[in-house]
Amino acid sequence: ALDAETLIRDHPVSTPSSRGGEEMAGVFYTGGTTGFPKGVMQSHWAIWASGMGSLPMFGMDRSSRYLHVAPMFHMADFAGGMAATLSAASNIVMQSFDPTAVYQTIAAEKVTHALLVPAMIKVLLDHPNAATADMSSMEKIIYGASPMPAATLERCMALWPHIGLVQAYGQTELAPVATMLSPEDHRAGGQILKSAGRPTPINDVRVVSDDGADCAVGVSGEVVVKGPHTMMGYWNKPVETQKALKDGWVYTGDAGLFDKNGYLYIVDRLKDMVVTGGENVFTTEVENALISHEAVQDVSVIGIPHDEWGEAVHAIVILHAGSSASEDDLTAHCRASIAGYKIPKSF
C-alpha cells in the first residue's frame, strides 16, 4: 500500500488547475449489458449535486465522523465522502476491511456514520465481539451496492436498535444515488423493508415500459432516472452512451415497480451482471474462463441468493461427451485467469 508521504516525495508537484461545473471530474468504471467495464464520465457538478441530495438522509454536520471502510475506488464511498465533506464532517479512513479493526476504530474514533455493503454488515454481525463492541457513537449506517438478505437486516436492527439504517439504491451512472429508504421506514418494518425507498430531493425516477410509457402502480418496467447527478456519458463509447442516456434520462437496466405510496421496488436486473459482496462480476468473463477448459462444451453463469454475499456466482456447465471434470478441477482452472471473488461458488 502507498501512503501520502511516499506519493508526495516521489512525484513532482502538479501545476495548479481550476476546474469545476460541467467539466469532467473523473472516470469511474462500472459494468453494463455487454459484460465489459465502461468508464462513466462524471462532472464536478454531478458529484456535488449527488452529495447535496444525500445530505438530508445522511444527517451529518461538523460534529459527525464518517468512516471510509468500503473501497474508495467505488463511486458509493466516494459520494459518501463528498456528503461528509459538504457537511464539514471528519473523514476517518481505514486501509482495508477487517471486522476487528472496524469495531476498534468505531470505538476509538467515535465514528457516527459509515457506508457498508451487506456482506460487510454480516461479517460484523458474525464476529465474536458483535454483542459487546462499543457502537454507542454510531448514528447511521448506510448500506447498498448489493441485495440485503432479510435475515441480515433483521439481525442488524435487533443488535443495534439505536442506529438509523439507510438503504441507498443507484449506480455509478448516477453518481451514484437515486433512491433512499429512511431510518423511519426501517423501523416501520414489514413489506417496506424490501423497498429501495423514494427518490432523493434532486432527482426524478420513473418506471417505463419498452415503448417509454410510464408503467402503472404495481407494474414492473425499466427504472429510469433524471437529475443534475446523471453522467456525462461513457468514455469513448458513444453508442453505449446513446442507449443509456436518452433526453437526460439514464436507463438503469434494472427492472422495478412503484407502490401506491411512491416507494420503488427493484424486482430484477436487466444487466448481465452478478453483484456479490458489493463487487460486480461480469458473467461473460466467468463463462469465458470456464469455456476454455478442454472438458467444457457449454456454460452459463448466473447469480443465486446468498446469505452472506447477497448473491453468489453459480455456473451451469455441460461437459463434452466422454469428458470429465470435477468442481475442484473447474475451480482450479478459473483461479488461473480470474479473481477469486469471480470464481463460481457452486456448479
Identify the role of each PLM range.
Residues 25-49:
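Conserved AMP-binding A3 loop
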Residues 1-10, 17-18, 321-323:
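Structural core segment of the AMP-binding/adenylate-forming
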Residues 86, 111-116, 125-191, 204:
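Gly/Ser/Thr-rich phosphate-binding loop
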Residues 24, 30-33, 66, 72, ...:
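Conserved S/T- and glycine-rich ATP-binding loop of Class I adenylate-forming
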Residues 48-65, 73-113, 127:
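Conserved AMP-binding/adenylation subdomain of ANL enzymes
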Residues 106, 114, 227, 232-233, ...:
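AMP-binding/adenylate-forming catalytic core of the ANL superfamily
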Residues 198-202, 210-243, 279-281:
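Conserved ATP/PPi-binding loop(s) of AMP-dependent carboxylate-activating enzymes
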Residues 11-29, 36, 59-65, 201, ...:
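Conserved pre-ATP/AMP-binding loop-to-beta segment of ANL
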